[in-house]
Amino acid sequence: KANLIWKQYLSPETLITTQVFDGQSRLVATIPQALRLEIDALRKEDSKYKALDETVLMAILASRQAVAQAGWQSGDVFGINIGSSRGATQLFEKYHKEFIETGKTATLTSPTTTLGNISSWIAHDLKSTGPEISHSITCSTALHAVLNAVAWLQSGMATKFLVGGSEAPLTPFTLAQMQALKIYAKEDQEYQSRAFDLNKTKNSMVLCEAASVACLELGE
């Protein structure tokens, strides 16, 4: 997957597409179909995963790959700090809509939409017994996970830490929020997302879905 990502970085073609959400045309960046199939397979792998939000499922898949590449073993003691800016917004919007329409909520509404369920489910999947931390600090959430893990490692309270972030914000409500803030990219721009263009004269935010995880540990 890393090779595919690097290949896309080198390509002059954008993966940003226009999709319709509740009748509104929005610019978004989605995960590849192959990864979508992996998420669907993960849902079926364990009956408990069926009700989880995509932020959790993507984080689990990314964590499995990171741990395998680092050579960590199932059951190893390591800390986990995976954050999310928007959290389980897909499930939250689904459950809220059901509540508005029926006046009732599903049993799993609370446990599957609380922010802490990302790191705890990763710990469950990897059978880790170390500390589990979740947080939300907007766009710098994943970076703060790295900073927090470094503090744990340097303090001697941990020797290994799994860190990162996961976002699945492509929902009508979340996209509408960004539009309301007037920070979203316009379709008539030549390059819609210009995050590193310090001379741009228009806002150029584009939401995407992704999970990124890294393994940090003390050196010898």
Feature-to-residue mapping (PLM):
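ACP-dependent fatty acid/polyketide chain-elongation machinery
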Residues: 1-48, 219-220
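Short acidic, glycine/serine/threonine-rich loops at helix termini
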Residues: 2, 91-95, 172-177
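A short glycine/serine-rich beta->alpha loop
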Residues: 42-52, 107-108, 132-135, 198-204
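N-terminal amphipathic, basic-rich helices that act as targeting or association modules
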Residues: 49-65, 71-74
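Active-site-proximal alpha-helical scaffold in enzymes
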Residues: 59-69, 115-118, 123-126, 131-167, ...
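Short glycine-rich phosphate-binding loop at a beta-alpha junction
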Residues: 76-83
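Active-site-proximal gating segment of KS-fold condensing enzymes and close homologs
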Residues: 84-133, 180-181
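Glycine-/small-residue-rich "gating" segment that lines the acyl/pantetheine channel
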Residues: 104-106, 147, 151, 168-220
